[in-house]
Swiss-Prot record:
The active site is at residue 129. Catalyzes the conversion of (8S)-3',8-cyclo-7,8-dihydroguanosine 5'-triphosphate to cyclic pyranopterin monophosphate (cPMP). This is Cyclic pyranopterin monophosphate synthase. Pfam families: MoaC. Keywords: Lyase, Molybdenum cofactor biosynthesis. Gene3D superfamilies: Molybdopterin cofactor biosynthesis C (MoaC) domain (3.30.70.640). Homohexamer; trimer of dimers. The lineage of its organism: Bacteria, Bacillati, Bacillota, Bacilli, Bacillales. Disulfide bonds: none annotated. It catalyses: (8S)-3',8-cyclo-7,8-dihydroguanosine 5'-triphosphate = cyclic pyranopterin phosphate + diphosphate. CDD domains: MoaC_PE (cd01420). GO terms for biological process: Mo-molybdopterin cofactor biosynthetic process.
Length: 161
């Protein structure tokens, strides 16, 4: 069973030891999205939602999620993050889709891909939570890693769809 990195000799879960790895600058950006109806879109851009500023709250949720990733992903190392940025862009060409990009960085011994993915997911979930009173039919779209840099495995950039 030793060919599995997160399973010990007894077949039980373990978190890998990264103490011998080099400290390098590591960055990851993840994408998620949520498609809403026109009324929700208008509430968000006009800042008229009864629960408050939807995008500011969602940004805070994404930041908190990145910082707490190791508490919800079992084999994820707790990291000292040095930067977290949540960015939004509306696509209103055929629907009302809010595209979310979460960028996380650190100087450390392991990457921040899971932190970026968790941040993007929590941001979309928070938009849903704050607007679900108007419509429960919103759709959270694909969540995926866009880029990562640093570390032994090198850089990654997702191919365009």
């Amino acid at each position: 069973m030793s060919e599995f990195t997160h399973i010990n000799e007894q077949g039980n879960a373990k978190m890998i030891d990264v103490s011998e790895k080099e400290i390098t600058k590591r960055t990851a950006t993840a994408h998620s999205s949520i498609t809403v109806n026109q009324d929700i879109y208008q509430q968000i851009v006009d800042h008229t939602n009864k629960k408050g500023n939807v995008l500011n709250t969602a940004q805070i949720a994404g930041i908190m999620a990145a910082k707490n990733t190791s508490t919800i992903i079992p084999m994820c190392h707790p990291l000292s993050l040095t930067g977290i940025d949540i960015a939004f862009e509306w696509d209103t060409t055929s629907s009302y889709t809010l595209n979310i990009e979460a960028t996380v960085s650190t100087s450390g011994k392991t990457g921040v891909e899971m932190e970026a993915l968790t941040a993007a997911s929590a941001t979309a979930l928070t938009v849903y939570d704050m607007t679900k009173a108007l419509d429960k039919g919103m759709v959270i779209g694909e969540t995926y890693l866009l880029t990562k840099s640093g570390g032994k495995s090198g850089d990654y950039r997702r191919e365009s769809k």
